[in-house]
Regions:
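Short, well-formed alpha-helical segments that are part of the catalytic scaffolds
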Residues: 19-32
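Short beta-strand/loop segment that forms part of the nucleotide-sugar
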Residues: 27, 37-47, 68-69, 98
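Cell-envelope/extracellular polymer assembly enzymes that use nucleotide-activated donors
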Residues: 9-11, 39
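Short beta-strand-to-loop acidic/aromatic patch adjacent to the donor-nucleotide binding site
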Residues: 92-103
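Donor nucleotide-sugar binding loop of glycosyltransferases
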Residues: 19-22, 47, 105
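Acceptor/aglycone-binding surface of glycosyltransferases and processive sugar-polymer synthases
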Residues: 68-89, 106-152
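A conserved acidic beta->alpha catalytic loop
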Residues: 44-53, 102
Length: 152
């Protein structure tokens, strides 16, 4: 597939807060689905459960993983903004955003990167035809779906 070209340097940005149970598995899944020049950037909001320390250990073992430790929890939106800025500073040619709770499937990364060949922006959504919420209880889906509609 074309997404594995040497010039492509995608960075996957993942904010974390109390994700110690997921962070190592998510890192492995993301790295498995990245092309050769890809990297993973975690943004930890000073998680009290030790998520940041786990990420530090992952960084020590794999140079493709980086972390931005933030002093306090400032919200998901600000975490993504900081992550996008850091990804661009690190030389990203493409930025992929994902959550650490596996609500976004890392197996979709190659498909999204391949889609960039025909578009400037690629958006994956669980609310479009063919989209889905795997493993979500009804209450979480309901709040997410109707909360998004209310905000719009």
């Amino acid at each position: 597939m074309w997404y594995n070209l040497p010039h492509m340097k995608p960075i996957v940005v993942i904010p974390t807060y109390n994700e110690r149970e997921n962070v190592a598995a998510m890192a492995a899944a993301v790295l498995e689905n990245l092309p050769a020049g890809g990297r993973l950037l975690f943004l930890d909001d000073n998680s009290p459960d030790g998520t940041g320390a786990i990420i530090d250990g992952l960084c020590a073992r794999d140079p493709r993983i980086a972390v931005l430790h933030r002093v306090k929890k400032e919200g998901l939106g600000r975490a993504y903004v900081a992550g996008f800025a850091r990804a661009l500073a690190l030389g990203a040619t493409h930025v992929v955003e994902m959550d650490c709770d596996f609500s976004h499937d890392p197996k979709d990364i190659p498909r999204m990167l391949a889609a960039v060949a025909d578009a400037d922006v690629v958006v994956g959504s669980r609310y479009v035809k063919g989209g889905r919420c795997v493993g979500w209880p009804f209450r979480r889906w309901f709040v997410s779906f109707f909360g998004g509609r209310f905000i719009r």
